[in-house]
Design a protein with these regions (language model features):
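C-terminal edge and immediately downstream basic/flexible tail or linker adjoining helix-turn-helix-like DNA-binding
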Residues: 3-6, 68-96
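Hydrophobic positions on the alpha-helical face of helix-turn-helix-like DNA-binding modules
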Residues: 34-35, 47-49, 59
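Short amphipathic alpha helix immediately N-terminal
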Residues: 24-44
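DNA-recognition helix of helix-turn-helix
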Residues: 52-77
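Amphipathic alpha-helical segment used for protein-protein interaction
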Residues: 2-31
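Generic detection of well-ordered alpha-helical segments
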Residues: 12-15, 32-33, 64, 68, ...
Length: 96
């Protein structure tokens, strides 16, 4: 799956599915926070920067890294993801 397709699919998931995926895949704390604030709380780059004490100019790159980490976990470490999270991962991976 291309990075662009992955991003589009993340945006189409329900909030419940996103919450389960973000909290249940074993992301690093910073990645989890970034994705949560952006997708669940709907915060802007400026708000995220303020909340996390980072420069707003670095939020985009940090989010890209967090999405890349999530994609890597889903692609390469799927067997480590808890069983209760896997149905939500399947939703993300379904072709639309």
């Amino acid at each position: 799956m291309t990075e662009s397709d992955f991003n589009k699919r993340l945006k189409t998931l329900s909030l419940i599915a996103l919450k389960v995926i973000i909290k249940g895949t074993g992301l690093k704390t910073k990645s989890e926070l970034l994705l949560w604030k952006f997708y669940i709380e709907g915060k802007s780059y400026y708000e995220i920067a303020d909340d996390l004490g980072i420069k707003s100019s670095s939020v985009g790159k940090a989010l890209w890294n967090a999405k890349k980490e999530l994609q890597t976990i889903i692609s390469n470490e799927k067997e480590l993801i808890p069983d209760e999270v896997k149905p939500y991962i399947e939703l993300l991976l379904q072709k639309q």
